[in-house]
Amino acid sequence: MNKFLKLVGYDESKKTTVRTELIAGLVTFLAMAYILTVNPNQIVGEGSPYWASVFIATALGAVIGTLLMAFLAKMPLAQASGMGLNSMLGGIIGGWGGYGAQFTPGQGFMLVLISGLAFLLLSVIKIKGKTFRELVFDGMPLSIRSSISVGIGLFIAFIGFQNAKIIVDDPYVLLKLVDFTTFDDSTKNAIVCLIGLFVISILDKFNVKSSIIIGVVVATVIGIPLGVTNLSVLAGAGDVSWKFWENFANFFTGENTVFLSFTKVFTEGIAPAGISVFTVVMILITMCMIDMFDTMGTIVGCCGGNRILSDENNKPLNYGKIMIADAIATCTGAVLGTSTVTTFVESGAGVSAGGRTGLTALSTAGMFFLSMFALPLFAAIPSAAAAAALIYVGVLMMKNNVKDIDFSNTVKSTSAFLTIAIMVLSYSITKGIGVGMISYTAMSIMSYVIQLVKYAVTKKNKPTFEVSAVSIVVSVLFCIYFFVPAVI
């Protein structure tokens, strides 16, 4: 037993016990279990014939990714399909992502695989003692990194508002708030979502670690008398079954399995006709950037400042292995048929509960494995209830990152604002990042030139060039993406 515990880094000197580690793993699972329902909804939509396959892929991706954290990194961190990236993938597959065409599920997952392989290379290749990933991360301005997270948070919250029918179409002003006086299906969905959101917010105020999943469950129950929650799925209706072996059989061999659609890429190509190679490249760069920022921000947030989980320089222990585990998980998840698997900030719930080693991650992985056998329970959760989780995660992403935007600097604040606004209004994460990067680089260079001219005249306050090579290269690539049509 002791030999096994050492495999996951368990050591009593870290001021923990087996019981504490197992409970911490359960706490982490409860904090992030919402992803099992939200992810299929985001990628293929509620009621899709692919829903069950994506659910199983989501669970398996979380199991494998979290096991990598347990045995490779030996850290109390959990992985699953990342929020924001699943919305981006859903837009790519659904045709509403602003790329001019609808990708097949297999093509979408192939993009995820390639971005994962790129992230893995960035995590391994070193230049002057630093991995290429660290150099890229350090080369991106903090205001842009933070605004990307804020923008994604607002973006997925906006999707949640639409899924719950809180925000509906309007022929005159495009969008409007649902009319609560009609008490129609849209109103009922909105009420269910708002109740769930309020429950989550109140519970989180009192530090209830499983607030999100409790709020989703409460919203689901409220939806029963309102006709929003469809309980027929619990009786075996639709494409899911309590006979778990049937769900697994469908995942590997069924007509509507994403797992098999992935293999069609080798005969159908990586992108639809009419999509340029450069567009594909920019999608891959965007995926890689988001995964990089999410992962590095999460592990520093969960482990930094904790004397047991970080070194004397406040750098998380086993930092390199954490990044490699994250990259491998992304590749594995793509092959299974789910969006980018990344380290979850909800891992902090388990750390707060006393998790200190990979045994916590092992416990979380075990819970995700068991969840695959309860597929109908998760399938019964209506989109309106799951939307409450989407909106609240958006709140958290904004709260945790907006403070890092320097609003006293007009160049940084303007470029950050454009990143956030364009991301939401264009319904495209890629375009939001592109406009933000170009505006930051252009305004920074113009400001430097003006300051340089001023220095040449006054010989006072010599300016420093603050724009990194990474920012310039990324901005040039986005300029080509925006201004040069039909490249290759």
Language model regions located:
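Transmembrane alpha-helix interface/packing and boundary motifs in multi-pass membrane proteins
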Residues: 65-77, 201-207, 286-294, 326-336, ...
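Active-site cofactor/substrate anionic-group-binding motifs, chiefly glycine-
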Residues: 50-94
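Hydrophobic alpha-helical transmembrane bundles of multi-pass membrane proteins
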Residues: 26-28, 35-36, 50-65, 148-152, ...
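Helix-loop-helix junctions within the multi-pass membrane cores of secondary transporters/permeases
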Residues: 2-39, 61, 82-91, 95-152, ...
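Helix-loop-helix hairpins and the membrane-proximal interhelical loops
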Residues: 1-54, 175-182, 216-320, 459-460, ...
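Membrane-embedded alpha-helical modules
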Residues: 101, 105-225, 229, 362-488
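Helix-coil boundary and interhelical linker segments in multi-pass alpha-helical membrane proteins
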Residues: 41-53, 91-107, 273-280, 382, ...
